Amino acid sequence: MTTVVKIGGARAVDPAGALSDVATLANDRDEDVVVVHGGSTAVDETLERMGIEPEYVETPSGVVGRFTDAETMEVFEMVFGHLNTQLVAGLQSQGVDAVGLNGVDGKLLYGPRKAAVRVLEDGKRKIRRGDHSGTIKQVNAELLETLLTDGYTPVASPPMAGKDDDEVVPVNTDADRSAAHISGALDATLVLLTDVEGIYADPDDPSTLIESVETPAEWDELEDAAEGFMGRKVMAVEEALSGGADEVIVADANADDPILSALSGGGTHVRASALESESDTSEGE
């Protein structure tokens, strides 16, 4: 069994428990684990220390994301490189033979650069140019499988390798969706760790945790419940399952033994059957 674990970058997320669980899975249980990490909060904090205001834009479809100009891209690379090294060192300290890499290494995450993005400003649709972001179209699963076979635990992160005419350039991409594409390519279980227990039917009420999503009707309810940042995680869930992952779990990074707890039933569990159309379901009956 291969498990892909995405460690979030929010201020409220402590990676210590997750790193301990990765060590348990990799060393004690001899299971394959790939770690993917974010770091958006650290990027914002670094920009602010430099006197630069982080810029977020809204697309016409209502999705809010970072606008990554050239200066922000440089900070992004610096911050993510630092975070990656810290996580690798943390795992090495626990006896895990971890290897750090980003999406540019070996074209781990590859796709076209989006230099221009459609945005919604003051109720009007506009095109913003100069963005350094990309859309993942390919995952170098062979690279990860080679590392896993040789006993290493990959620790991966954005940026991705963006195709820009005849060049390959580092560009920003969402860490949740990076983890989704990697888990799909490896036919793995994806654990998305965040700063809440899972996905709530009522976003303001933790007692409404959605524990299991296995049918198209339950999937519709999940999509309706996802608001704000959780909406982006649901997009990642869909991409992972559509790409080949067998299950996605959204769980609390700050729980005791967060990964082991998630794999044992904690959090919100979404199965690939939730994305089957009604025609697919009826054909199987």
Task: Give the location of each predicted region.
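C-terminal catalytic "cap/lid" subdomain
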Residues: 2-60, 72-285
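Active-site loop-to-helix "anion-binding N-cap" substructures in soluble metabolic enzymes
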Residues: 60-66
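An acidic, glycine-rich surface segment that forms the CoA-thioester-binding/catalytic face
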Residues: 69
